[in-house]
């Protein structure tokens, strides 16, 4: 007999943190939002600034109760990598039913759930080979961290991902940010005679402002 998987009534989620702030990067910079940071990731970038392995389990009802204490109606589901979270669909269905605008921040190796209103994908150049076999096809914005010479990777992501906005972000390691080299690479991308998209700079303005 085939086993039927039934979702629990109050599923548990790996929660790193939930907090209200302003979106600090990309097209929606400045947008008031509640960030729901989920634990665990299917990549392990050396420069990642998120402790996605330190999390606690939290039930769906408690998550919803926490969200209702905030004024913002925009929810940013981030990580870690949200698309590997068990019972993600149930969480998203519940939030949509409550009338929230749902944004997803993902590395783009898995498809975005249909409940999402805005997809910001950040493919990782240090895992370029993985994107040859699995890659999201559409997004609202693409944000790539310039953790080296990423020109060829950016061109490949242009071909693989149809998006409205394309951003290159500086990489911060050991307190230093390679902003000059990031701007230089943006200039090269935008000066190509056959350039089909326009790349822009995205920086983590929330860090400069001293907010979460």
Swiss-Prot record:
Q: Which cofactor does it need?
A: [4Fe-4S] cluster; S-adenosyl-L-methionine; Mg(2+)
Keywords, comma-separated and alphabetical: 4Fe-4S, Iron, Iron-sulfur, Lyase, Magnesium, Metal-binding, Queuosine biosynthesis, S-adenosyl-L-methionine
The record lists [4Fe-4S] cluster as bound by: 41, 45, 48
The record's section on Pfam families has: Radical_SAM (PF04055)
The cofactor binding remark recorded in the entry reads:
Binds 1 [4Fe-4S] cluster. The cluster is coordinated with 3 cysteines and an exchangeable S-adenosyl-L-methionine. Binds 1 S-adenosyl-L-methionine per subunit.
From which residue to which does the signal peptide run? none
Q: Kindly state which reaction or reactions the protein catalyses.
A: 6-carboxy-5,6,7,8-tetrahydropterin + H(+) = 7-carboxy-7-deazaguanine + NH4(+)
EC assignment: the record states: 4.3.99.3
InterPro entries tied to this protein? 7-CO-7-deazaguanine_synth-like, Aldolase_TIM, rSAM
Where along this sequence does the record place binding of Mg(2+)?
50
Enumerate the residues binding substrate.
22-24, 37, 78
Single GO MF descriptor: 4 iron, 4 sulfur cluster binding
Question: Which is a GO BP term held by this UniProt record?
Answer: queuosine biosynthetic process
* CDD domains from the UniProt entry: Radical_SAM
Record domain Radical SAM core: where: 28-212
What is the protein's known function?
Catalyzes the complex heterocyclic radical-mediated conversion of 6-carboxy-5,6,7,8-tetrahydropterin (CPH4) to 7-carboxy-7-deazaguanine (CDG), a step common to the biosynthetic pathways of all 7-deazapurine-containing compounds.
Oligomeric state and partners?
A: Homodimer.
What family does the database annotate? Belongs to the radical SAM superfamily. 7-carboxy-7-deazaguanine synthase family.
What HAMAP family does UniProt report for this protein, alphabetically? QueE (MF_00917)
Q: What is this protein called?
A: 7-carboxy-7-deazaguanine synthase
Which organism is this entry from?
Neisseria meningitidis serogroup B (strain ATCC BAA-335 / MC58)
């Amino acid at each position: 007999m085939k086993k039927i998987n039934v979702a629990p009534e109050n599923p548990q989620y790996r929660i790193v943190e939930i907090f209200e702030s302003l979106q600090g990067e990309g097209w929606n910079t400045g947008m008031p939002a509640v960030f729901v940071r989920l634990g665990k990731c299917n990549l392990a970038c050396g420069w990642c600034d998120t402790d996605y392995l330190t999390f606690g389990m939290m039930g769906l009802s408690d998550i919803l109760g926490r969200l209702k204490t905030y004024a913002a109606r925009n929810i940013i589901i981030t990580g870690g990598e949200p698309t590997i979270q068990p019972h993600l669909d149930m969480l998203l269905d519940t939030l949509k039913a409550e009338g929230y605008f749902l944004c997803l921040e993902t590395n783009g190796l898995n498809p975005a759930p249909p409940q999402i209103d805005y997809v910001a994908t950040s493919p990782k150049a240090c895992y370029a080979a993985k994107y040859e076999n699995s890659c999201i096809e559409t997004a609202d914005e693409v944000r790539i961290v310039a953790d080296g010479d990423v020109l060829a990777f950016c061109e490949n992501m242009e071909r693989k991902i149809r998006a409205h906005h394309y951003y290159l972000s500086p990489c911060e390691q050991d307190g230093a940010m390679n902003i000059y080299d990031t701007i230089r690479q943006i200039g090269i991308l935008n000066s190509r005679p056959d350039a089909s998209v326009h790349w822009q700079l995205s920086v983590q303005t929330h860090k400069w402002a001293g907010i979460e």
